[in-house]
């Protein structure tokens, strides 16, 4: 067992500690059981970190199991994507990936056992009729007219279902529990239904498929899971989980434990809503960097360490709440501040001509890759007569608080010289096209010899060697913290969630690798996007800004000011 002093404490770990201390379990065995009907999001990451993390901390094991009981919505592409996401987060499952479909033969046998015990029956009622007979939270359900069919007849009917003798929607196997139960999931739930659908693992072997609630508990038991961790919406279903295992011949009975799901502000995690966003071209796909899918976060430049740290910081409780986006952003900002090499980029360029710098000359200047980590080394950047700076870094006149370049005043260029702005050239609309300056040749790496103070520092790139680049600057996808609660969700989309800028980067970035993280000095953290490979040009995604620009906005929304 891992050092308990180094582990975060929560109610789940307290349960596990008690189980191990009492001898109820000798080891810990968890699982991550996604349904392969979509891509994983940050909420799944919380479950991954919890299940795999607990297994690691207790020297136990964690299975990856695909709950593939609904072939209508499942695809091999989703299976492969889920495997990739789990591995990207840094986790390795026990043995080969499992599939609930691996257990279809056993599941079918357990269904027959329930029939033989008089605890399941085939219902020929329509789906609408079954829904009507189910009752409401305030009214008990009504027994199906097929509820008291004999065991022999039910065995024959279920065999006919299995043999494909009933059409879809005309017959279903239901557990016989209690139609007056205050818990809707216990009112004779369907545990098998007819589906004439090709399955991505079992092919056309089956035309009856078990329901999730019947499959999940049995799969856990067959795999010897000790602690079955799931989100709070399955709390009532725990009664069905236990009922199934209590009424079949199986030795293992895992303990289901529920925890709160992750609700992240300014985004959505519903597969239905995200699919609509994709279909209506509101986002580019499930890996759009504005979506909190694991693929989207990875494309945006989030690291596995930052996602795992986020999941640790939010903790595990039984209380549903909204987690601020700024907490996720703080995790990647903290990570990249330490680990991302620095580089220079200009996103809204205006040209500077240094008139006293020799024409045609260039020099290579040393620039540290990280100001606080000498072990990250340095790189060489080209300095030349013509350079690009950010348009917002120049003013014709400004007050003393503006510590950048002002006409007739000086500023230092990062890792280079002090320059002074002498005059400007504008176009017919008054837009500044060129700033003419002169430089102090004796200020490379040192202060001016006469002791004058130059307070501001700005970044730049050589106009002669810089590479053209596209910058995709991302913001919150929605303008409200909880868009799913809005009546017209799409009206709350942020029209400025993606702003595309054209500019330049230092020449060294021509060799940047896909997904490689950088801090563009004074601008933010960026990574090379996958479109750079397909389009043959430099495209960088903003991962996160240097500072939390939304903190004040969120505070105002909280206080109502």
Curated annotation (Swiss-Prot):
Top-level enzyme category: ligase
Catalytic activity: tRNA(Gln) + L-glutamine + ATP = L-glutaminyl-tRNA(Gln) + AMP + diphosphate
Record bears the keyword Ribosomal protein: no
GO molecular function, one term: glutamine-tRNA ligase activity
Name of the protein this chain belongs to: Glutamine--tRNA ligase
SUPFAM superfamilies for this protein: Nucleotidylyl transferase, Ribosomal protein L25-like
Subunit structure: Monomer.
Motif range ('HIGH' region): 34-44
Binding-site residues, ATP: 35-37, 41-47, 231, 261-262, 269-271
UniProt-listed NCBIfam families: glnS, PRK14703.1
UniProt-annotated location(s): Cytoplasm
